[in-house]
């Protein structure tokens, strides 16, 4: 496949988005969000997410990400009395966790801090080290907090949902609304946002029509939301995220192909999971548990995914690169301009785009 040299430059993935286009609250019901349906060759249709029911066919397989978002944003008080914030990312063993810290320069190795409850310092923690590649801090939590499941009771007491910084209001409803209906495995620090559109009613209607569903797990972290800063994308590296592909999912994909169905990814995290694991095994999907850091950008050959339901992504993000790999950078940016003009809502609580297999640029 020939690659336009501009596809390898980060600046080629920039676009101007009016602040009014950034969704601040989700729509109700979930499936009421707008859906930009991409047409083959050229053009698009403005519909709603519920209309995805008309686009999918009996025998198709929807692959969703079943990760559950942790209440991973914690307020801390420093020894000098000032407040700070931690975003809990990944376990490092023995109750030690990699966290993003703010203000980072005020949290130094050896510092004692305390989690805040009801405005007062409560549970003591220790800053152990600086993690150079992410700029994060290694924090000592209670030693029993070795994984997301054992840390979650602490987060439920002290933490809040880690909404993105472009969402300026937050309340108790986010605890349910910033989770998918199928979230089951704790570990993410951001939602797999395309899945937020799939209501229980829509999922039931899809099942009744004969559309299958299977789950993959990718615990969304730095690899998804960290800004890309490398202009030369041939040098781009992403942080690893933990992925699990089960034997049941591998069998579901194989059965879908055998019956002539289409493998449809719900969200870019599902794409990264499926393609990342396949890439580790010569293009063949196999059961897997472990870190994945695959970069998907124009020129990438998809081995598993044929169609995609996705949200509208930030300029110059790795997610924009991924979607461009499927339908082409220039066409994607044209579709984004249509969405802006037509008043679509962008980012995590925003609207969605449907890219059917016949719109893929894959050979």
UniProtKB/Swiss-Prot annotation:
Name the job this protein performs: Transfers and isomerizes the ribose moiety from AdoMet to the 7-aminomethyl group of 7-deazaguanine (preQ1-tRNA) to give epoxyqueuosine (oQ-tRNA).
Q: What is this protein called?
A: S-adenosylmethionine:tRNA ribosyltransferase-isomerase
| InterPro entries named among the record's database cross-references | QueA, QueA_dom1, QueA_dom2, QueA_sf
GO CC aspect terms: cytoplasm
Compartments in which it is found: Cytoplasm
Q: State whether keyword Transferase applies.
A: yes
Q: Which GO terms describe its biological process?
A: queuosine biosynthetic process; tRNA wobble guanine modification
Just give the chief location class. Answer: cytoplasm
A molecular-function term among this protein's GO annotations: S-adenosylmethionine:tRNA ribosyltransferase-isomerase activity
Instruction: Describe its assembly.
Output: Monomer.
Domain of life here? Bacteria
Q: Is S-adenosyl-L-methionine one of the keywords?
A: yes
């Amino acid at each position: 496949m020939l690659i336009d040299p501009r596809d390898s430059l980060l600046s080629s993935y920039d676009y101007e988005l009016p602040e009014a286009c950034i969704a601040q609250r989700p729509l109700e019901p979930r499936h009421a969000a707008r859906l930009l349906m991409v047409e083959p060759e050229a053009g698009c249709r403005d519909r709603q997410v519920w209309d995805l029911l008309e686009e999918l066919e009996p025998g198709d397989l929807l692959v969703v990400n079943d990760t559950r978002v942790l209440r991973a944003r914690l307020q801390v008080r420093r020894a000098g009395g000032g407040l700070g914030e931690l975003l809990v990312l990944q376990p490092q063993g023995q109750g030690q966790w990699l966290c993003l810290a703010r203000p980072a320069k005020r949290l130094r190795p050896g510092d004692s801090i305390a989690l805040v409850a009801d405005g007062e310092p409560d549970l003591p923690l220790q800053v152990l080290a600086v993690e150079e590649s992410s700029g994060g801090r290694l924090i000592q939590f209670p030693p029993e907090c070795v994984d997301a499941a054992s840390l979650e009771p602490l987060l439920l007491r002290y933490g809040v949902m880690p909404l993105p910084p472009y969402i300026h209001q937050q309340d108790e409803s986010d605890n349910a609304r910033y989770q998918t209906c199928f979230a089951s495995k704790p570990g993410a620090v951001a939602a797999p946002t395309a899945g937020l559109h799939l209501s229980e009613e829509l999922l039931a209607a899809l099942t009744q029509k004969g559309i299958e569903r299977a789950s993959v797990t990718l615990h969304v972290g730095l690899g998804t939301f960290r800004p890309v800063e490398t202009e030369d994308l041939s040098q781009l590296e992403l942080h690893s995220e933990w992925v699990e592909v089960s034997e049941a999912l591998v069998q579901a994909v194989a059965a879908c192909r055998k019956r002539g169905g289409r493998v449809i990814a719900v969200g870019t995290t599902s794409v990264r999971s499926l393609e990342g694991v396949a890439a580790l095994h010569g293009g063949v999907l196999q059961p897997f548990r472990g870190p994945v850091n695959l970069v998907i950008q124009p020129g990438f050959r998809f081995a598993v995914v044929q169609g995609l339901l996705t949200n509208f992504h930030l300029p110059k993000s790795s997610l924009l690169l991924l979607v461009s790999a499927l339908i082409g950078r220039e066409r994607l940016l044209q579709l984004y301009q249509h969405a802006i003009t037509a008043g679509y809502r962008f980012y995590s609580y925003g609207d969605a785009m449907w890219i059917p297999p016949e719109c893929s640029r894959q050979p």
